[in-house]
């Protein structure tokens, strides 16, 4: 398969990967002890129900979007993120929640590169985007340990939004 060519739904590697991620997340949420991908998510560890990932466009660029536009929720800060969690999948269209990047203090960041030196972890949000997975050529799964990563600092400026 190559980028930009029209293929059937089952020939899109990004769509297939997101479908597998969703199945694994749902298995953990349902406390399914026999998930096929338990090496990524362990159903016995409470709170680890997210496989964060990055998606790349057909030119190799990272896809990014914005959360909390207008600053109406939590710390009132709009942010840019390249990190996502799959929520729903229908054919090759997906609802992705935008994961909020945070620094070691738990403050919201705008992150356009995964190696940003201030980036420490991710928090789940209720901000979502609808995407056509056929528009992407690559996906990179990240460690579930990035989500709700424990920080040595306690004074956070916003509340967790799950």
Curated annotation (Swiss-Prot):
Keywords: Disulfide bond, Sporulation
Record-linked Pfam families: Spore-coat_CotZ
Cysteine pairings via disulfide bonds: none
Domain of life of the native organism: Bacteria
Record's subcellular location: Spore coat
GO biological-process terms attached to the record: sporulation resulting in formation of a cellular spore
Residues making up the signal peptide according to the UniProt record: none
Quaternary structure and interacting proteins, as annotated: Disulfide cross-linked either to itself or to CotZ.
Name of the protein this chain belongs to: Spore coat protein Y
Gene name of the encoded protein: cotY
